């Protein structure tokens, strides 16, 4: 009887929170049957995503030691838009049960999160000590998800290298990282693999290498002095070294999983790569070649090795001896090292050829000999959003999916991030801020584009909204809100479902969908 009473209370609380959203302004939800969950394959899964440093908080709690992001945000607060950090973030570490309840309320099939390496291995290695409290946290989270019918999709590395390894040998600039990474993931597979059936080795390795080691905007903040105001780094060599050791770490992880765990646990493993769709700025042969080159340098940089065992030919030609080489043994290990492609897509770019190229002040940015822009003749590439880098380009999403299908042997694809932000306008009341109608339109357009790609043969099997909750958005701090769930950073981190969460709830329950104007 007590269990039945608790169940009734839970149901009432869910209805109340959904009703609160209706009460705000029911006009935002115009229902139709134009796009529903039933439009997608039966086993297609829908979810939302997060990452450890961006959401967990509890930075110095229960044995966790600093990552490079803890150090970067303290050492270079001027590189964060609002000077903030992830010390507290959403306090997901303490409030995960509340957040899982919201996931269930929305109707998520799956939740993507990452594991904090330095919460499991505070010093980065087993020799430095295994933190049982960290293992316990992720066990509790995984169990809570599964008990609520939500499938975990776990990212092993989401940009948060243990600071101890950065101090000891330079982190991903050193081949030693491959051994230490495999040691770390082995613990994760052993501790969580009986319940986690899908793993992402590394999130957006291209963005980590470019932003962290070419322009220095994110941790660890390295670049050549002629690129940005960095005190250390080499933008002509370090991005390629870091990428190389990321790829080898990924491949060694997949090899370990396949040899030791996959047959027993029955799971799958892949890498997540972010890309723009590269559109020739003008209909000329030079622009068309430039767009292909831009894709090679951004997406193919990682997708080519894990599919074919080596970097794109264009990179070999243009980067020369600054691009590391795989040994025959490494190439064999790297080739085919995925069960699925993880794709993060947000927006598109126009691309044109750079006609004049100087052999001075070299960097990853100049090596591709292209110029990326967000406008052509004063017209933006898509509808603008509150973020000056993100324009709404759903047709580019379809093009990316079909490009992956045709160039990379039609792999299984999971769309592991797709989303758009609203600005964190502190002058707005919470009730007004909860109405994020533009975000609903964005997702409707992109889901329609995804369906079209599937109809043309792309093997897409999942879609994850970025993000579950408003969180710490790297170099932008708390400037933007991507979440389905509003986090009130001014009032005790209280959670409120946004209108986009209600739309997703209706979409996932197959009852209705948002009608676009």
Swiss-Prot record:
Q: Does the keyword Signal apply?
A: yes
Catalyses which reaction(s): Hydrolysis of terminal, non-reducing beta-D-glucosyl residues with release of beta-D-glucose
Write down the EC number: 3.2.1.21
- What is the enzyme's main class? hydrolase
Sites where the protein binds a beta-D-glucoside: 54, 158, 203-204, 346, 417, 466, 473-474, 482
Could you state a single Gene Ontology molecular function term? beta-glucosidase activity
Q: Span of the secretion signal?
A: 1-23
Highest taxon of the lineage: Eukaryota
Task: Give all cystine bridges in this chain.
Answer: 223-230
Please name the PANTHER family in this protein's record.
BETA-GLUCOSIDASE 17 (PTHR10353:SF44), GLYCOSYL HYDROLASE (PTHR10353)
Q: Which GO terms describe its biological process?
A: carbohydrate metabolic process
Alphabetically ordered keywords of this record: Disulfide bond, Glycoprotein, Glycosidase, Hydrolase, Signal
What glycosylation sites does the entry record? 229, 361, 371, 510
Question: InterPro entries per the record?
Answer: Glyco_hydro_1, Glyco_hydro_1_N_CS, Glycoside_hydrolase_SF
Sorted alphabetically, which Gene3D superfamilies does this protein's record hold? Answer: Glycosidases
This chain's protein is named Beta-glucosidase 17
Q: Which organism is it from?
A: Arabidopsis thaliana
Keyword match NAD: no
Q: Where is the active site?
A: 204, 417
């Amino acid at each position: 009887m007590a269990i039945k009473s608790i169940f009734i209370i839970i149901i009432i609380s869910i209805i109340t929170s959904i009703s609160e959203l209706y009460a705000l302004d029911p006009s935002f939800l115009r229902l139709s049957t134009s796009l529903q969950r039933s439009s997608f394959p039966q086993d297609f899964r829908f979810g939302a995503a997060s990452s450890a440093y961006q959401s967990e908080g509890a930075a110095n709690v229960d044995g966790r030691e600093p990552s490079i992001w803890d150090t970067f945000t303290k050492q270079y607060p001027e590189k964060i838009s609002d000077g903030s950090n992830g010390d507290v973030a959403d306090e997901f570490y303490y409030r995960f049960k509340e957040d899982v309840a919201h996931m269930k309320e929305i109707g998520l099939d799956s939740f993507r999160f990452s594991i904090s390496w330095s919460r499991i291995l505070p010093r980065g290695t087993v020799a430095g000590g295994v933190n049982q409290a960290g293992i316990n946290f992720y066990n509790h989270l995984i169990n809570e998800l599964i008990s609520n019918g939500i499938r975990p999709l776990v990212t092993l590395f989401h940009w948060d290298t243990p600071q101890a390894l950065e101090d000891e040998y330079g982190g991903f600039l050193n081949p030693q990282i491959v051994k230490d990474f495999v040691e770390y993931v082995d613990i994760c597979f052993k501790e969580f693999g009986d319940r986690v059936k899908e793993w992402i080795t590394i999130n957006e390795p291209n963005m980590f290498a470019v932003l962290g080691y070419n322009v220095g905007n994110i941790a660890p903040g390295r670049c050549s002095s002629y690129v940005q105001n960095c005190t250390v780094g080499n933008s002509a060599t370090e991005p390629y070294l870091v990428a190389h050791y990321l790829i080898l770490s990924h491949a060694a992880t997949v090899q370990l999983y396949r040899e030791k765990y996959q047959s027993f646990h029955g799971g799958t493993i892949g890498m997540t790569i972010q890309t723009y769709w590269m559109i020739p700025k003008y209909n000329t042969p030079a622009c068309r070649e430039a767009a292909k080159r831009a894709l090679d340098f951004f997406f193919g940089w990682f997708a080519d090795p894990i599919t074919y065992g080596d970097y794109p030919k264009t990179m070999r030609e243009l980067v020369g001896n600054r691009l590391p080489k795989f040994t025959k043994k490494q190439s064999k290990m790297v080739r085919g090292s995925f069960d699925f492609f993880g794709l993060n897509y947000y927006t598109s770019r126009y691309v044109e050829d750079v006609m004049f190229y100087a052999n001075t002040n070299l960097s990853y940015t100049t090596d591709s000999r292209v110029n990326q822009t967000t406008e052509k003749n004063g017209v933006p590439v898509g509808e603008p959003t509150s973020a000056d880098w993100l324009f709404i380009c759903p047709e580019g999403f379809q093009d990316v999916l079909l490009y992956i299908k045709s160039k990379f042997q039609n792999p299984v694809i999971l769309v592991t991030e797709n989303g758009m932000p609203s600005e964190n306008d502190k002058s707005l009341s919470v009730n007004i801020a909860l109405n994020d109608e533009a975000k609903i339109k964005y997702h409707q357009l992109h889901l329609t584009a995804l369906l079209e790609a599937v109809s043309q043969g792309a093997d897409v099997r999942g879609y994850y909204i970025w993000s579950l909750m408003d969180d710490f958005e790297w170099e932008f701090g708390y400037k933007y809100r991507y979440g389905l769930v509003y986090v009130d950073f001014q009032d005790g981190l209280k959670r409120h479902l946004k209108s986009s969460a209600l739309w997703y709830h209706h979409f996932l329950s197959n009852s209705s969908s948002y009608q676009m104007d």
